Amino acid sequence: IEVLLGSDDGGLAFVPGNFSVSAGEKITFKNNAGFPHNVVFDEDEIPAGVDVSKISMSEEEYLNGPGETYSVTLSEKGTYTFYCAPHQGAGMVGKVTVN
């Protein structure tokens, strides 16, 4: 599945913002905006036992331009919450359920 960082109208959002994947399915986050975004998984809102450092970008790491991507594959079933560090306060938060 491809998830856009930034809506087509310039909104600070993940598109889609709430989605499901199968365990082992690749998720590709793609910057859809002219400014930096990233994908940080919330260590308190992922399944127990998952190492957040293995799935998350760091808060200081960015996809700086349109078309830049970050991919991750989640193998543990459950719900994962993620956010864009610079825009979390503006509501740029998403959720993925792994089945």
Curated annotation (Swiss-Prot):
This is Plastocyanin A'/A''. NCBIfam families: cyanin_plasto (TIGR02656). Keywords: Chloroplast, Copper, Electron transport, Membrane, Metal-binding, Plastid, Thylakoid, Transport. Its cofactor is Cu(2+). It is found in: Plastid, Chloroplast thylakoid membrane. The keyword Protease does not apply. InterPro entries: BlueCu_1, BlueCu_1_BS, Copper_blue_Plastocyanin, Cupredoxin, Plastocyanin. Participates in electron transfer between P700 and the cytochrome b6-f complex in photosystem I. PROSITE patterns: COPPER_BLUE (PS00196). GO terms for molecular function: copper ion binding; electron transfer activity. The keyword Transmembrane helix does not apply. The sequence shown is that of plastocyanin A'. Changing S58P: In plastocyanin A''. It is a peripheral membrane protein.
